Amino acid sequence: MHWDLFCRVIDNFGDIGVCWRLAADLGARGESVCLWVDDASALAWMAPLGAPGVQVVGWDAEAGPGDVVIEAFGCDPPPAFVAAMAQREPRPLWINLEYLSAEAYVKRSHGLRSPQMAVPGRGLDKWFFYPGFEPGTGGLLREPGLMDERHRFDGRAWLQQRGLAPQPGERVVSLFCYPNAPVDELLHALATTPTLLLTAGTALVAPRPGVLRCLALPWLSQSDYDRLLWSCDLNFVRGEDSFVRAQWAGAPFVWQIYPQHDGAHAAKLDAFLALMLGGAEPALADALRRLWHAWNGLRSGPAAPPPAAPWQALARDWRDRLLAQPDLVTQLLGFVAERR
C-alpha cells in the first residue's frame, strides 16, 4: 500500500522524530511511504541515510493521495489534498495519529470514527489512533528485531569507540531535557558519586570540579541515540520519542514531560507513573514520584534518586510488560486491514 504521512514541526523536533520512526518502520515492512513535512531540516542529522521505501516531500508538494493518509497529531493536511481524498475511488483511509498518553481517555477514544461533514472532506471518515501502554490502545513504536539488537549490544565498547569511555567506577548518565529543567539541582545530586554525564541535543552543562565529568554530544541520529540510551546506567529524557526509546533501553530513566500552560501535563505525568509503578515496592514508588515531580517542577526541594538495583529491576520489569503487547505498526497495519 501507499501511505501519506503528514507532519508539522512545532518545536523541539519531537513530532518529526515520531513521524520518521513510523515512516521508516512502515518502509522496512514493505510499505511505500510519502512523508509530508513542513521543515525537514532535522532529518539531516536524525536520519542522514534515509530509509528504504520512504520519500520526503515538502508540505506544498503536488501529489495525489494514496491508500492511507495519516495526519500526525491533528496537523490538518492541506485542503486541496483533502479534497482530492474525497474524490478518489476507492477513498483512502484517513487516520489521525494522536499524542501518547497513559490517561484513561485513550482506551475510550482509540479507534473511534469521526464522519466529516464539512468541505473539503465531506463524506470522508477520520479514524482516531491512540498510542498507549496498555491493551486496548495502539501500543508503542518498536521495530522488529529491536530487542534482539539491544540484547547483543555492548554499551561500553560503543562508548569506547566514540571516545566516551567511563573511568573505573563511574556511572554513565545521559541528559536530554528542556531549558526549564532544574539542571543545577541534578548536578548537585549526581556529584555525590563518580559520574560521567553525557548531554545530548541542546542541554549545556558547565564543567564542574570533583567526581562529576560532563561531556557535550552533538545531535545524534536516531539509531545512535538509541545506542546512547542502551549504554547508560540512567537516562534523563524529554517529550515523546526519547521517552519511548528509554523504555526499550530497559535502564532507569526520568522523563521530563512537555509542559502545557494549563498544567494538564501534571495529570498526564501521574497517569504514567501510576501504570509503571503499579505493584512496585512502596518506598521505591514514593522515591520515584518525588524525583519525577521535582524534575518536572511539580514540587520544590531536592529529590535524590533511589538505589540503583531496585530501580533497574523495575525498569526491566516495565519493559517486559510493554513487550507483551503488539507494537504500534503491527497494530496499525491490522487496523487498516480491518477497515479497507
Residue ranges and their predicted role:
Residues 1-4:
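Extreme N-terminal starter segment of soluble prokaryotic enzymes
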Residues 17, 180-188:
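A conserved mid-protein helix/loop that constitutes part of the nucleotide-sugar donor-binding site
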Residues 20-23, 220-268:
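A donor-sugar binding/catalytic signature common to diverse glycosyltransferases
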Residues 98-181:
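A nucleotide-sugar donor-handling region in carbohydrate enzymes
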